Swiss-Prot record:
It comes from the Eukaryota. Its EC number is 3.1.3.16. GO terms for cellular component: fungal-type vacuole; nucleus. This is Serine/threonine-protein phosphatase ppzA. Its cofactor is Mn(2+).
Length: 540
């Protein structure tokens, strides 16, 4: 895990706010304590506990649930922070995540060389066509990929389920009133905001609408298990970190929902300039397509982390602190991990010494904050590493690093073929770990305007062939030009006169936000050769 910066070509105007560059000093507070490394960067008067204390007397706030066991227990209820929080410096330090891969030292791979070696089958500015062995998908658009099981373990804290969901006193915007037509309008406004290329002082949605979205999403997350079991095909997305225009580029390249099924691995907020639009669009798509669009929890979907690294400040500046608190309540309900076709284990961070059975994940009671230690902490924070030992303290200052033997034993024990995770900046957007037993996917290109990294999305076909689609790193000027072109195409499609039958089709597409999937300034990279599929054993 190297620490060198990429050869970024962007100017200082591209970097986020005033956050400095990454350094190892961010993570040397303690060995495995999440709050140990976070608290030193938070003023006592601005701690998440202090920020929410005066907002409401509602005791259902999941972020304030006290732990009933010891700190080293693997339970996943939160442990309250002490009151004597150390002072925070005026300029917040960068987050202890994502870590930087050693690929950032080596530079981008030579795509031509990769093609000659057989690793890359297709590189183009348009989708793979003709003989590309993707295989036809038998799944219909909008068909559920969520595998449901009777009497599935899914513990929910009773006092949370019995508590009324807060809607900011707006009777017309309760969860029952959040209808499909409301979601369509909200999605349209959010996309309009993205295509405008402007970061506005306020959000395009009203506070009452944001509260309603969060309340509905909260209940939906709790209705689905903490360990999602999904079928293929699906596109797996890594860290996004508030890079809203890049998220729109991602949907342009891979297909707006429900044309494609999606599984996001977490880290939707912090660092980027438009975390609010990013998480709101994702939540709206989750509500619109609940069994085709899935969001896992990342280590940044946490009160303490968002308080330090940007999202709290953005909510306070553009909405209010109560909106931030509502998002935290929603984050505390997110699912933790997922499996794809019973062969690919997906999680934000990595593995845990506390994980012996998949029921350990299913048994995580929600809503829950991220505890100091234990299973949930490790799943969101741990990293793979080239080392002889099975486990060792993570240099982030939180959780562990794990070696090849741990991964191999995990795959064999649970009959998986691949671990797919995010949580780490990698130069080419994706990076395999030894013998392709684990892959890191990072989907925020030109991360923070500081790294010249690509963004990647891993596509898993119905036949379990794995491919990667890449988002080219663009500086702020190139990104604006790209979005303007996309806006023109979108407006042209929406305003073009069509015959009645085609009009009905276009209306249906607009209803599902299926706009033209152009891949300008993006690269489709396809990995599908027999030896790869055979070595993974990813087959029916």
């Amino acid at each position: 895990m190297g620490q060198s910066h990429s050869k970024g070509n962007s100017g200082p105007g591209d970097s986020l706010q005033s956050y400095p560059s990454f350094s190892r000093s961010d993570t040397k507070e303690s060995l495995r304590s999440l709050r140990g490394s976070i608290r030193s960067k938070i003023r006592s008067s601005d701690s998440p506990r202090g920020s929410t204390a005066g907002l409401s007397d509602d005791k259902s706030d999941a972020a304030s649930v006290k732990s009933t066991t010891s700190r080293r227990s693997s339970t996943n209820q939160s442990v309250q922070s002490p009151d004597d929080t150390p002072s925070q410096p005026d300029a917040p330090e960068p987050p202890p995540s994502p870590s930087l891969s050693s690929s950032l030292k080596r530079g981008h791979k030579d795509v031509n060389a990769m093609q000659q070696s057989g690793e890359v089958d297709h590189v183009s500015d348009v989708p793979p066509t003709g003989a590309a062995p993707t295989g036809p998908s038998t799944q219909k658009v909008g068909e559920s990929i969520l595998i449901k099981r009777e009497n599935q373990l899914n513990p929910i804290l009773d006092f949370i389920m019995n508590a009324p969901l807060e809607t900011s006193g707006s009777p017309g915007m309760g969860m029952g009133a959040l209808k499909s037509i409301d979601l369509d309008d909200m999605i349209s406004r959010l996309l309009d905001a993205g295509y405008s290329t402007k970061v506005t002082k306020t959000v395009c949605l009203k506070n009452a609408e944001i509260m309603a979205i969060c309340s509905a999403a909260r209940e939906l997350f709790l209705s689905q298990p903490a360990l999602l079991e999904l079928s293929a095909p699906v596109k797996i997305v890594g860290d996004v970190h508030g890079q809203y225009t890049d998220l729109i580029r991602l949907f342009e390249m891979c297909g707006f929902p429900p044309a494609s099924n999606y599984l996001f691995l977490g880290d939707y907020v912090d660092r980027g300039k438009q975390s609010l639009e990013t998480i709101l669009l994702l939540l709206c798509y989750k509500l619109k397509y609940p069994e085709n669009f899935f969001l896992l929890r990342g280590n940044h979907e946490c009160a303490n982390v968002t308080r330090v690294y940007g999202f709290y400040d953005e909510c306070k500046r553009r909405c209010n602190i109560k909106i931030w608190k509502t998002f935290i309540d929603t984050f505390n309900c997110l699912p933790i991990a997922a499996t794809v076709a019973g062969k690919i284990f997906c999680v934000h961070g990595g593995l845990s010494p506390s994980l012996s059975h998949m029921d350990d994940i299913r048994g995580i009671a929600r809503p829950t904050d991220v505890p100091d230690y234990g299973l949930l902490n490790d799943l969101l924070w741990s990293d793979p590493a080239d080392m002889e030992e099975d486990w060792e303290p993570n240099e982030r200052g939180v959780s562990y690093c794990f070696g090849k033997k741990v991964i191999m034993n995990f795959l064999q024990r649970h009959d998986f073929d691949l671990v797919c995770r995010a949580h780490m900046v990698v130069e080419d957007g994706y990076e395999f770990y030894q013998d392709r037993i684990l892959v890191t996917v990072f989907s925020a290109p030109n991360y923070c305007g500081e790294f010249d990294n690509w963004g990647a999305i891993m596509s898993v076909s119905g036949e379990l062939l794995c491919s990667f689609e890449l988002l080219k790193p663009l500086d702020s000027t190139a990104l604006k030009n790209h979005i303007k072109k996309g806006r023109k195409e979108r407006n042209s499609m929406l305003s073009s006169p069509v015959s009645p039958p085609l009009l009905r089709f276009v209306v249906a597409k607009e209803d599902h936000n299926l706009f033209v999937q152009h891949r300008r300034d993006a690269c489709g990279l396809f990995l599908a050769y027999p030896s790869l599929v055979t070595s993974w054993g990813i087959s029916r």
